[in-house]
Curated annotation (Swiss-Prot):
Component of the Mediator complex, a coactivator involved in the regulated transcription of nearly all RNA polymerase II-dependent genes. Mediator functions as a bridge to convey information from gene-specific regulatory proteins to the basal RNA polymerase II transcription machinery. Mediator is recruited to promoters by direct interactions with regulatory proteins and serves as a scaffold for the assembly of a functional preinitiation complex with RNA polymerase II and the general transcription factors. Residues 7-30 have a biased composition (Low complexity). GO terms for molecular function: transcription coactivator activity. The lineage of its organism: Eukaryota, Amoebozoa, Evosea, Eumycetozoa, Dictyostelia. One of its GO terms (cellular component) is core mediator complex. Belongs to the Mediator complex subunit 31 family. The keyword Zinc does not apply. One of its GO terms (biological process) is regulation of transcription by RNA polymerase II. This is Putative mediator of RNA polymerase II transcription subunit 31. InterPro entries: Med31_sf, Mediator_Med31. It comes from Dictyostelium discoideum (Social amoeba).
Length: 176
């Protein structure tokens, strides 16, 4: 390799990185990495930042699981909703409805279910498989039809607006 490259082969046949971090490959015992630089950039500046990120990810995953009626049925049948601490946790998770957090949610119906889980009656109904099946069916129909209908409704509204604009342009201004 040329000497202008940051990676060079030394006299022993090992590959060296001329930057601050030295990476050495040994043929005998695999790869070994020798770090000479203490200024390596870590993804987190401190343990608290890493803990906050992990909490964010875990809460996001849990919130999104709430969009699954079968998972809600599992929680109900395993008596999670009878635990006051768990119910309080669901109340705490309401902050995910704020726009700065909601933008990370892929399944927005999870926020709707989070609202419903604040109701004792809804939590009780989730114990019954018929209720869970009904919720699942309604969710499926919403995905199947509402999205498509919503797009056709938007297209119709757009066409009406365009027609109104064209009519306004064609009509000459009236003078008194």
């Amino acid at each position: 390799m040329s000497s202008s490259s940051p990676i060079n082969e030394n006299d022993n046949g090992n590959i060296e990185n001329n930057n601050e971090t030295n990476i050495t490959e040994n043929g005998d015992n695999g790869e070994s990495i020798d770090k000479k630089d203490d200024n390596i950039v870590l993804p987190y500046e401190n343990d608290e930042e890493e803990a906050n990120y992990l909490r964010f990810i875990m809460e996001l995953e849990f919130i999104q699981c709430l969009s699954n009626p079968r998972y809600l049925n599992y929680l109900a049948q395993n008596r999670y909703f009878q635990d006051k601490a768990f119910v309080n946790y669901l109340v705490y998770l309401q902050y995910w409805k704020k726009p700065e957090y909601a933008k990370f949610i892929v399944y927005p119906q999870s926020l709707y279910f989070l609202d419903l889980l604040q109701e004792e009656r809804f939590r009780q109904e989730l114990n019954h498989s018929q209720s869970t099946d009904f919720i699942h069916e309604q969710q499926f129909y919403h995905w199947q039809y509402y999205r498509n209908n919503r797009m056709s409704i938007k297209e119709q509204e757009l066409q009406q607006q365009q027609q109104q604009q064209q009519q306004q342009q064609v009509q000459p201004p009236t003078t008194v």
